[in-house]
Every structure is written in C-alpha cells, then in structure tokens.
Regions:
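ER/Golgi luminal nucleotide-sugar-dependent glycosyltransferases, focusing on the catalytic module
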Residues: 2-334
Length: 334
C-alpha cells in the first residue's frame, strides 16, 4: 500500500500509512482529522559535494560557505546576516546548528553529518552501525523517511545518539585533546550557570559519552540548548590562541560542543525527568563519493569493535598516533 506524503504545511485528514516490519504490515495513524503536522527539519552538514540522503525533512546544508565551500546545495550556513560560517574551521558542523538557531523556523530541529545519520529504526541496537555507502534502500532500512521520522518523534522531546563507552568523559577528552580547553568551559559554566554543576560533575565522571553533534530536539529544547551552548563556546573562542594549531586541533569548539551536549542532556535528565529522551544508533557511511552498483547493493553490518576503537582512539588524536607508531615499530607495517 503506497500513499502520497503531504507536505509539512498541509493537514492530514484521517490518513493512514503503512510501515513494513518483517512480514507484518502495521498501519500507523499519523494524525487525527484537522490536526496540523509539526514542521521537522533535519540538516545534514556537508563541507564538500557528497551523496547524501535528502527528502522533505532531511536537507543537506553547505557548511563553511564563507571559506570557499562551492557545493551546489541550496541551503548554506552563510545565508542571512546572523551566521558564523567564517568560524567553520573551528566550530565544524556547529556552524549549521548556529545558522538554524538564528535563521530557520521549525517545530523540530535535527542535525546529522554527511557520514553520520541517526537511525529511526533498530532501537534495540546498543551500538553504532556501519554501512559501506548510500545504497538504494537506505531510507527504508533506517527509517530515514517522513513516515518513520514522524512516528518516532511523536511525543518525543529529544532524540540522541546511543552512548559510547569511554572510561570517563573527562579522561577521554584529556587523552585526545588539550584538557585546558575543557577546563575553561567547565569553569565558565560553574560561574555563569551554577545550576549545571551537578550535571558537569556527573557527566565528566560518566563512563559513557555522547558524540558526533547529532540529535533531534523540539523547538523549546533546541533554543534553550543553543542559548547556553553558544554563550559558552563564544566565550571560549574569544580567548583561545589558535596560532600554533594544526587543521585538526583547530577544531576545538566542535570537540567541546560534543562534551557540552552531554552535560546538557545530563542536566535535562536530572532536572526534568518527565521529558521523553530516546537513544538511537548512529549510522556511519563509509563511502559518500559514489553510489556505484556494488555499493548500492551492499547491506549494512553492525561493527561494535570499530565504533569502540574510534571512541577510545579518535582519528587524529595524539593517543591514536602514539599507538600507530608503536604498532609500526613492532610490526613494521603502515
């Protein structure tokens, strides 16, 4: 059974849609007669031309547009007067989040990355999922379509990625980056947002972390989060000396944003336990440059080991480079 999907501006009169679940077909009533469908926009940050999932809800956005991003995507992080596109080298995908915060009207705001999507299915999966590329049925397999997205978000306040084991969030950041940067942010929070001190202490000691700067939130939560987040990050950015940093280390604000998101979610859990917060696995796309037949026909596979390795030894981190040197010295392999 195939039904046309109405735009976000239209109402749905007793429309039923089908959702396949194995051999069983479940009929899902999305909205009652006369009710307005909430507007949902999920932005996919792209710093170069890539093959991405896109539809009426999931939209690619060119990030770093002020820095020479020549992609042809209609949405760009320098549209409108209030943007931080010029800070993309330091803020990474957060320039898309800031742009939406200042320029986009919606009821739900979401953020993915051209290689990282959250699945709107497989909620029993407690690890991330690796796929080789964008293939023909990827929207169906991971619920990246309007029907699944609306069904999952109905009544949900915040959709977040599954947490990754890291030892402790404080020590993981210390091993991968300059801990003085995180400590600046934590001091700033203590001084200006003391109501977050409990969440800071709990999350920094937590052995599981939130990563990737991906989530979907209601308008109210999104704006509250952005007011808090960008106040902290701008204070950090204004005092940070970037002159001696390489192209990886300069992405400090983006790295800090991941940790601050975890603090914010922890604060919500502690202070507003009635909020509905749902965890979803992150789908990692390996090849976003082409959709050749062999890629399109390849099914996804779960890879707990790779996801855990990339969290403990993040790509480009000093710890990972140190381990590589040891491996090469012992085995003589590149």
């Amino acid at each position: 059974m195939q039904l046309d999907v109405l735009s976000q501006e239209e109402t749905r009169d007793n429309v039923l849609e089908t959702k396949e679940d194995g051999d069983e077909i479940k009929i899902v009533e999305l909205k009652k007669k006369g009710e307005q469908l909430p507007a949902i926009k999920i932005l996919v940050s792209c710093h170069k031309s890539e093959i991405v999932v896109q539809n009426d809800i999931i939209c690619p956005i060119a990030v770093g547009a002020d820095n020479g991003n020549k992609t042809s995507f209609e949405m760009r992080d320098n549209d409108g007067e209030d943007n931080i596109s010029h800070l993309n080298a330091r803020f990474c995908e957060l320039t898309a989040q800031y742009w939406a915060y200042k320029n986009l009207k919606s009821d739900y705001y979401g953020f993915f990355h051209y290689r990282r999507y959250m699945s709107f299915r497989h909620f029993d999966t407690k690890c991330n999922i690796n796929v080789p590329g964008i293939y023909n049925n990827i929207e169906q397999d991971f619920g990246l379509n309007e029907s699944d997205i609306r069904q999952v978000l109905d009544g949900v306040d915040l959709l977040v990625p599954v947490q990754i084991p890291v030892g402790s969030n404080y020590n993981q950041y210390k091993a991968a980056h300059d801990i003085k940067d995180l400590e600046f942010c934590l001091r700033y929070i203590s001084q200006k947002y003391p109501e977050y001190n409990g969440a800071v202490q709990r999350y920094m000691k937590d052995t599981n972390g939130y990563f990737y700067n991906v989530f979907v939130a209601t308008k109210e939560i999104f704006f509250e989060y952005c007011n808090w987040l960008f106040d902290i990050l701008m204070a950090f950015d204004n005092q940070k000396d970037y002159s001696d940093l390489d192209t990886y280390s300069i992405r400090t604000a983006g790295f800090l944003g991941e940790r601050l998101f975890g603090v914010y979610v922890t604060h919500l859990k502690m202070t507003r336990p009635k909020l509905k917060i749902v965890h979803a696995p992150v789908v990692f796309i390996k090849n976003t440059h082409d959709n050749t037949p062999h890629v399109a026909k390849t099914k996804y596979k779960q890879s707990i080991g790779t996801s855990a390795l990339n969290c403990v030894l993040p790509r480009g981190s000093r710890r990972r480079e140190f381990c590589k040197k040891i491996y090469k010295s012992v085995f003589g392999k590149k």
